[in-house]
A protein has these predicted regions:
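Core transmembrane helices of Major Facilitator Superfamily
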Residues: 28, 109-121, 332-344
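Symmetry-related core transmembrane helices of the 12-TM Major Facilitator Superfamily/SLC fold
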Residues: 169-185, 392-408
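Juxtamembrane intracellular "pre-TM" segments in multi-pass secondary transporters
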Residues: 2-11, 191-236
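Helix-to-loop junctions at the C-terminal end of transmembrane segments
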Residues: 63-75, 282-295
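Cytoplasmic helix-loop-helix junction between adjacent transmembrane helices
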Residues: 108-145
């Protein structure tokens, strides 16, 4: 932004980015906890329900590859509008799905849209938020996203009661994405609100905003970048994949657990929504811990807590108070996840080469998303072969090993308190 532009404030991006993000995440928050429930209602086994829930993460992983080129070609705001429209199509497909396979395709498409929306909003912030405000804006964006993930399930409770089924709650995704589209379409041009931005021109190409250029660089030559940085990605990137895997396993296992215990659809949404409130409440604390004490004091306790929460689930499924233990485990997992808020983005920023960070950050994000995509498939496979308790126990063991791995690797690559 140029010096002649109007004075910037964080509130100026509230309607442009924060409100569409809140609406999109409310829709996702309403839908995600009920995917396994909807799948089993359509006749899927517990294992297949896990696969269908995991299609969201698989879609995000696949969407990582073309999303940068798409955002660079059509722009940040148009990409967010397109992603929200595609999400509406996916949500309608989920509502009307006659069988588990159609539901799985709809959830996969939603994952593709989520990848594009996430990159587009990040690119928008890069283009229009001055550097000195960017960390606060991105931190607030993360908090807004987490707020939606706990508001969504709570909104779905009365909708489930009114419609009589889990798929009825998917209408929340449709309505919230439609509202996001209307906001993005009706807003004036961003450069009218924030002033002119410096545009990047390369030979034979049109002008790009800095965010569009960042998006293109992140996805260009992804596999070449993975090979170039194979050393640090094998050591630290594997840690990112483990964190992604633990988070995805939590997202899939909690609803699966509720189904296996016979918890009602409305109560499932309520429990996961309240757990999301705990997660949301800790996102600022995580940033303070990372800045004051070092990245290791966020990454290791978070991963360890996720592992211990999974082990608690594994050993309490068949106890007389299994539902009480389920609620306790959901709370522990949410505290652990909240303590790790922003850790993957922060570690990626710390490790990225300062001169040209975008390609590395694209490879870093892909590595974390690969772990997220793999975890639900592992959970589904173990559930199908053995039981959901064995699946939780295996993921819990991975969490313990992941915490040990991060405790060894982070001090080797990142100072105890970066910037001090």
């Amino acid at each position: 932004m140029t010096d002649g532009n109007p004075a910037f404030s964080i509130r100026s991006v509230a309607v442009v980015v924060f409100l569409p993000t809140l609406l999109f995440s409310i829709g996702e928050g309403a839908l995600i906890p009920l995917i396994p429930v909807a799948a089993t209602n359509l006749g899927a086994s517990l294992a297949i329900a896990g696969v269908i829930a995991g299609m969201l993460m698989i879609g995000e992983l696949v969407g990582d590859i073309p999303s940068g080129a798409l955002v660079s070609r059509i722009g940040e705001r148009t990409s967010m509008i397109g992603a929200a429209l595609l999400s509406i199509v996916a949500a309608l497909g989920a509502v009307l799905a006659p069988n588990p396979w159609v539901l799985g395709v709809a959830i996969f498409i939603l994952g593709l849209a989520t990848a594009v929306f996430a990159l587009a909003r990040h690119a928008f912030m890069t283009s229009y938020v001055p550097l000195r405000y960017r960390a606060r804006a991105l931190s607030t964006l993360g908090g807004v996203f987490r707020a939606g993930l706990f508001i969504g399930p709570l909104l779905s409770v009365p909708v489930i009661h009114f419609t009589g089924g889990a798929q009825g709650a998917f209408w929340i995704m449709t309505i919230s994405c439609l509202a996001a589209v209307l906001i993005l379409v009706l807003l004036p041009d961003p450069e009218t609100l924030f002033g002119q931005v410096h545009r990047v021109r390369k030979s034979g190409a049109s002008d790009h905003t800095p965010g569009e250029e960042l998006a293109a660089e992140e996805s260009h030559g992804l596999f070449r970048t993975l090979w170039r940085f194979r050393g640090v990605l094998a050591r630290m990137g594997s840690g990112a994949a483990l964190i992604g895997a633990m988070r995805a396993a939590r997202t899939v296992l909690l609803p699966l657990w509720a189904v296996s215990l016979g918890v009602s659809e409305a109560n499932t949404a309520l429990i996961i929504g309240l757990a999301g409130a705990v997660d949301f409440a800790l996102f600022y604390v995580s940033g303070q811990v990372m800045d004051r004490f070092g990245r290791i004091w966020s990454a290791v306790p978070s991963t360890l807590g996720l592992g211990l929460g999974m082990l608690l689930l594994a050993f309490t499924h068949d106890t007389p108070n299994a539902v009480v233990w389920f609620i306790a485990a959901a709370g522990i997992l949410s505290v652990a996840n909240g303590l790790g808020s922003g850790i993957l983005m922060t570690l990626g920023a710390d490790l990225a080469p300062p001169g040209r960070p975008a390609p590395f950050l694209g490879a870093w994000r892909f590595t974390g998303d690969a772990g997220s995509a793999a975890a639900p498939l592992v959970v589904a496979a173990i559930t199908g072969l053995l039981s959901v308790s064995f699946a939780a126990g295996a993921i819990g063991a991975v969490g313990i090993l992941g915490a040990w791995h991060l405790a060894r690797m982070i001090p080797r690559y990142i100072p105890a308190r970066p910037g001090r």
